[in-house]
Amino acid sequence: MDKTQKGKFFEDKAVRYLESIGYKVLHKNYRSKYGEIDIIAETDNVIVFVEVKGRFTENFGSGEESITKKKIDKIVKTALQFIEENNLQGKDFRFDVVALKGNQIFHLENAFSLE
C-alpha cells in the first residue's frame, strides 16, 4: 500500500467513525493554496476540521505526534479560507485529530486552536 492508499484507508475509517457518532461529513480532502484538511464535518451546530493520522504500528511514533506547528498553521489557514468561501463567519468551529493505530481510534477534540 503506497502513501496515498494508506491515507485514503485511514481517512475512510475516520469518516465511518465520525458518522457513527453522529457527525455529518461536509467535505473530504478540502484543498486551498495553503494546504489540505482531511475531513470537514458538523456536529451540534459546530464545524469541525479534522486532521487524520494513522499508523499500522508505532515504530515511527504515534500519528498525533506527527502534527507539527507548521502543519497546524496550514490547517488553520485552510480552515479560515473554507469559512470565508462558505460564508460561515459567526459559526462555532474547532480543530480535532482522529488518530488510528491498528484497530484503535483516538478522537482528540479541540486538539489545537487558532493561537
From Swiss-Prot:
Name under which the protein is recorded? UPF0102 protein SYO3AOP1_0546
Record-linked Pfam families:
UPF0102
Family membership: Belongs to the UPF0102 family.
Q: List the disulfide bonds.
A: none
Recorded hits in CDD domains, A to Z, give: PoNe_Nuclease
Q: Where is the signal peptide?
A: none
Could you tell me one molecular function GO term of this UniProt entry?
Answer: nucleic acid binding
Write down the InterPro entries for this protein, in alphabetical order: Restrct_endonuc-II-like, tRNA_endonuc-like_dom_sf, UPF0102_YraN-like
Record-linked PANTHER family: UPF0102 PROTEIN YRAN
Give TM regions.
Answer: none
What the entry lists under HAMAP family is as follows:
UPF0102
